[in-house]
Amino acid sequence: MEYLIEETDEHKRLDKFVSEMFEDVSRNTVQDAIKNGLIKVNGNIKKSSYVLKELDKVQFDDDIFEIKPLNAERIPLQIEYEDENMLVVNKPSGMLTHPAGKEKTGTLVNALLNYCPDMLSDIGGEFRKGIVHRLDRNTSGLLMVAKNNKTHEFLQEQIKTKTAIRKYYAVVKGIMDSDNGTINKPIGRNLKNPQRMDIVEGGRESITNFKVLERFKEYTFVELELKTGRTHQIRVHMSSIGHPVMNDTLYGAGMSKVHTQEQVLMAYSLTFTKPFSDEIINIQIDYDEKLKRVLNYLRSKN
């Protein structure tokens, strides 16, 4: 079994990462397995204290622990596009993209295992089958899913080279002065609060374009385009310029009078090259219920 480390797991100790994946296995058992060379990173034996880096590969035999396989769950999927190699799904707000920590049910991966159990890439490991990129739990919208590893690599390369275009809608706090612009600030993990990302000197290059669509008394409706894809990128960038995403309590917005499942943010547009062809696919979706309710309220008060 192999797990590809994503940015969200970077800076975790090796023993902590493995313990979080397998809640029924004690930390001591995990540490013993690491010490005895049963758990490796990139094919090499490491200490339990080894700090993981993005794209590290954590490797061990399937039978090292009594691992319970993920359940395939009959969760409705809103599929916006599908061909023989991939699909694009519209993830609702409130749903995890893939299992994390003790949460191993009700995720998009659980739903995908029911929809196409034998047709999902496994580059990211058993818990991230098919997942090419992710959305935060309370961000809704479009996600690409790969049915095989070649397609997974093809789509990830488009994200890496910035040829895949991902656009979002957000309502942000405050009235933005500029009609459009670019935020180019490096992002890294907040070492005091591992749930947060921050603007960090020496962090990863992070670029977000924004365009104002509508202004209200205390909020602004914006379109955002990711040029890079860091964890919480839009949320961190907008907070850094004094306009946190509405209801994003983690990044300083507080909860407004219009209560929602946290941040008012959705991935509404996705443009990419169809795998192994020259055909350009563009998919756009309408406002989700959260955004509709917020915009209706703000327009009624304007």
Descriptions of predicted regions:
Residues M1-N302:
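RNA pseudouridine synthases
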